[in-house]
Swiss-Prot record:
Protein name, as recorded: Pyridoxine/pyridoxamine 5'-phosphate oxidase
Cofactor(s) required for function per UniProt: FMN
Family statement drawn from the similarity comment of this UniProt entry: Belongs to the pyridoxamine 5'-phosphate oxidase family.
Swiss-Prot/TrEMBL GO biological process terms: pyridoxine biosynthetic process
Oxidoreductase among keywords: yes
Alphabetical keyword list: Flavoprotein, FMN, Oxidoreductase, Pyridoxine biosynthesis
Length: 195
């Protein structure tokens, strides 16, 4: 790996651009780790939908397990791993909800079937069978007909404001490169870590 950038977001976007060219499926897939109010962790894959100086954005059902955990404990970590590139990025930080306007704008870009699915899925609740879900999808499809599907009140997005971003690049004999950026006021403090 060449000398790291002073701004981790510049390096992040370079790596993401390379991942989008190299990864066949969902290069923006990331493991999102949350914890409940008692500190019990859970992790799942979600899709990164935006990254800038304000943070890393993803969208979800607010009533899901992750939504409830983020409401109770607004701290999280995410990890993007691209096996074909032998790279990984880990991010830690605090969580805030995106604005209703931002959530509405993203929701409007989703496929209609995904919009209806956001209404139909009572995410993380027990499901007696596939037919129950398909029935709910049909009910909401009939409700909205050919009209616009509004964003459900229980569906929005979160922004992880990074306080630490670590870039890992595989090297022979486990002598990997690790560059750790820690928020320092308005800038970043960079350290090269032992593998």
């Amino acid at each position: 790996m060449s000398a790291p950038e002073a701004d981790p977001l510049v390096l992040f976007h370079k790596w993401m651009d390379e991942a989008e060219k190299a990864e066949p499926n969902d290069p923006n897939a990331m493991a999102l780790a949350t914890a409940d109010a008692e500190g019990r962790p859970s992790v799942r894959m979600v899709l990164l939908k935006g990254a800038d100086q304000d943070g890393f954005v993803f969208f979800t059902n607010l009533e899901s397990r992750k939504g409830q955990e983020l409401a109770a404990n607004p701290h999280a970590a995410l990890c993007l791993h691209w096996k074909s590139l032998r790279r990984q990025i880990r991010v830690e930080g605090s969580i805030t909800r995106v604005s209703d306007e931002e959530a509405d704008a993203y929701f409007a870009t989703r496929a209609r079937a995904s919009q209806i699915g956001a209404w139909a899925s009572i995410q993380s609740r027990p499901l007696t069978g596939r037919f129950e879900l398909e029935k709910r999808v049909g009910e909401f499809a009939a409700k909205f007909g050919l009209g616009k599907v509004p964003r459900p009140p229980h569906w929005s997005g979160f922004r992880l404001a990074p306080r630490r971003i670590e870039f890992w690049h595989d090297r022979p004999f486990r002598l990997h490169d690790r560059f750790d950026y820690v928020r320092d006021g308005d800038g970043w403090h960079l350290e090269h870590l032992y593998p």
